[in-house]
Amino acid sequence: MSAILQYDSVSKGTYSVKPKPTESLGNEFSEGLFVPLIGGKEPIEYVKLRENLCTKVLNELEEITTHTTYDSNARVLRQLCEHASEPVDETGLLRTAIVCDKSSNSMHLKFYEQLKDDMEKIGWKNFVVLNLKAHRDLKSCFRVIKGGSFGLGVLSYDIEKLDEKTVLVLEDVEDCDRRLLSSLVEALSSLVRHSKLQGCLYTIFNLKIPLEMFDTSLDSKFLSNVKTKVFNMKASTEILESLFTSIEESLSLKFGWRTRRFFRSMFYERSWSVERVIECIRYSILTHFYGNALSIIEHLIYQKDFHLISPLHLTTLRTVPSFQRHIEQRLEIGDLESINYVEKMLNDDTYFQEMVIQMCENLLYRERLLRTQAKIWHELEMAVKTTTRISFADYLETFLQGDWLSSPQYKSICQAILRMNSTKALACLDYLNENIFTGNQTMKCLEIHQELSELIRNSSTNYLEPVEVRMQNYSGTKHTRKVVESGFDKSIIDFSKILKKIVGLLDEEVQYGCLGTESIDMYPFYEVLFYDYCRPLNQAFASGHQRSVIHSSCMDPEYYVGDEKKIDSEFSNAEKDGKDLISWLPDLSILYKLYSESGALLNLYDWYIAFSEHLQAGKENLKEDDNHPRESPQGNLQRELNELDEDKRKLEEAKLQSRFLFGLEELRFLGLIKPTARKTDHVMKTIYHQ
């Protein structure tokens, strides 16, 4: 959670996550989603403008998503339609297409919709998606096939009475029961052998694992009933990279580097589906316009409607964290000019509005400049052929963050330049002088270019290699390395020095040129033009908020139950007396701590024994304090006491078992455990498997 909280200061004071209750806002907004912000003082026309802008951006996202996913899937869609349209052979085998991309995600919802539309155009009227992992027998499979689990088509329960062509997509085939898969394929194959049903069924396997792993798990009965053809889809990560490139170029709303990094981590680190990433992007757009009253400023500036920027907006703009930081920096200078500037910015609305427009335009220009520079450096990386390559989106994130000078990719480019030959070095200098170097660096680059050209003309050959290349396989000591290098021709040593000058000139350009090392969120009114608020996205999609609350409340219940100071004093007194407060802890807390220490499967009996031992520990401490001598009873009295102790022991054991079972039910209700069919005396963890 610390990684999330440290970013909240970026948008502090900009987003209102708890608007005024709708019942006090009038009838006009009693049914709408958007409500007046800024303490309920926002005019109604601005609320409607925020809603219209949000709808516009969401429609833009839908168009971009549809266009990008269709272009990415066009090849496979065309191949599947051609395969489904092929004439039926006389073997009577079930025609099957296996679609895979060797990743955790294969087909996605957009692909299903596009495939259904294309299949309908060529005569396949029904479209059914069947998740085999959720079924255990053929009857339940055919029941789902009848109704259409995806809701895109209806299939008659009596399959022999089919009169329309049907596309059947099988999901989770790698995780289902192999016997069920073989039986289903055998049943479908026997149906299509019927004279009336030949060519009426086309089966598609959605495979999420490499094809080689799937082949090894199949039996001869499966292979004898199908005629398969493999289609390799574009990986989900490639589709999402294309989607992000289109969003960056076309979407009206700009995303900051924090939200961009969160989006991309979803499909690289968590391997989420395409729909889940798009859903998160939609949620971020809605959050920006729903909770930010200043989200209309960019639209007003773009439309030149400066008169619509109200005094209420100007007052709110003065509370933006980036502007407050800008004012504090000017006050630290302390000269008369800075003091007058701050006074006019805080008191003169006309001057402040002019500066807001100018600063927002400068910020948008800065973003366009960084985007252009990211493309240039990305092309340079491909030209110098570095050992590792990253996507354009990674480049842009690094540039927006202002960390390009210290990034591993920049160092990799510099290392590649130090290993260039003379021909590539001349071409690299021409590219740098034309696209990257500015100001004094341009003149220095021309001087280096002239020096290198003269060195090549004076050398015995027109081809030079640096010392780094000639010594790359040398494994001697530093002293012997210097001795070997001293034996090289002078032109080679001078060429290596020229390459180092190029790298030094690049360092100067990155640090002091148009790029700089300052993050874009340091510019005033960054929060107004960019959405970079990660907390709602983490809480809604990363599942960190709910899990962290459950974890912290079970591990440290003293922060959630009773008076914290009183509990702290009780703990300190217990530590002084050599006792513990295990008996005070809730049963759920004790069970959860044992849960956290175990593996993926938990034996219920072992868990119960450990739970009872934890509860008995507190009672044993109390018994140790009772050291008063007592006379032992004799005769019938002893037998009666033994019977009472036995009844008491059974009663305590029954209470202990009930407490344990109640705690298990609480863990199940929270979604932390689930029963397993293989071992009835075990339960399985749903999270924290490691």
From Swiss-Prot:
CDD domains linked to this entry: Orc3
Role according to the record: Component of the origin recognition complex (ORC) that binds origins of replication. It has a role in both chromosomal replication and mating type transcriptional silencing. ORC binds to multiple sites within the ars1 origin of DNA replication in an ATP-independent manner.
Family listed: Belongs to the ORC3 family.
Pfam hit, one: ORC3_N
Source organism per UniProt: Schizosaccharomyces pombe (strain 972 / ATCC 24843)
The name this protein goes by in its record: Origin recognition complex subunit 3
Gene name of this polypeptide: orc3
Record keyword Nucleus present: yes
Compartments where located: Nucleus
Source organism superkingdom: Eukaryota
InterPro entries recorded: ORC3 (IPR020795), ORC3_N (IPR045667), ORC_WH_C (IPR040855)
Predominant cellular place of this UniProt entry's protein: nucleus
